[in-house]
Amino acid sequence: MKTGLILEGGAVRGIFTAGVLDRLMENGIYYPYVVGVSAGGGNAMSYVSRQIGRTARQINAPKSESYFGLRQFMEVHKIINLDKMVYEYPYKQFPFDFDTYFKSGIEVEYACTCCETGKAEFFTESSDEKRLLTIAKATCSVPMLCDPVELDGKHYLDGSIADSIPIEHALEKGCDRVVIVMTKPDTNVAPTNYAKFRKVINHMYKNYPAFVDACMERVENYNKTIALMDKLEREGKAFVIRPQIPTISKFEQDSRKIMELYRHGYTLMDKRLMELVDWNEGRTPVHVENVGHAPALAEEMDDEVLLASG
């Protein structure tokens, strides 16, 4: 029985996923297939490279090193400087273990939305560092805020436009069951509705009519995916973990709020760890109340936050 791991996006909300995955890595839980979407792609990279804490530190970087915000707008005239995050972080501020990643044996894919077709395409890379990073850039290139990324002769933007939670794709890849990490506390919370920005989208992507259609249909397709997820969860074929507290802004800059969501992801996964282990092994899940202690990594990072804030 093959189990896949699906990681939803959500920009800074991906810090919740980082907490969940750090707890899984501490317990040596790795799945043979992983698919990341948007910010979920960054989490997938650190999970496959087995770097506990890396994504959390990257998302909650000090303002002087952050890849988004007013500072970046003043420096590069963009609110989001993906080139800094994608091509600089892995070699400087937050070193990425390419060797472990490429030798992991895990099949990992990244969902990207093709501008020419409006469809989701899934990329993987097992040896080329630059191509891997370009794929990572494409999956999290937010419409209206980022330029399309050229890859293999076509252009791509955020994977969540065409497939926010690629459950069907994971099943097509041979997964019998899936673990899904969500970044929204409630399935009734819809993703960004780009139909509200119809005029802007039509103007900016007039050369990509299929992409415009994908933006307009996003919420409808998302709701269909949620219905499938709920069905699989009822059938015991999906293990879903999502925040149980009010979430933060997608571009939150308050380090303490960000760390609170990280700690929540970590401790929530800790509480449900035995339930997941039982589910992984096909046993009837048993809920185990294990509040535990605050993760040492979170405490260490809290100290970093205080130092960074002066």
Q: Residue spans of the language-model regions?
A:
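Patatin-like phospholipase
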Residues: 1-37, 45-310
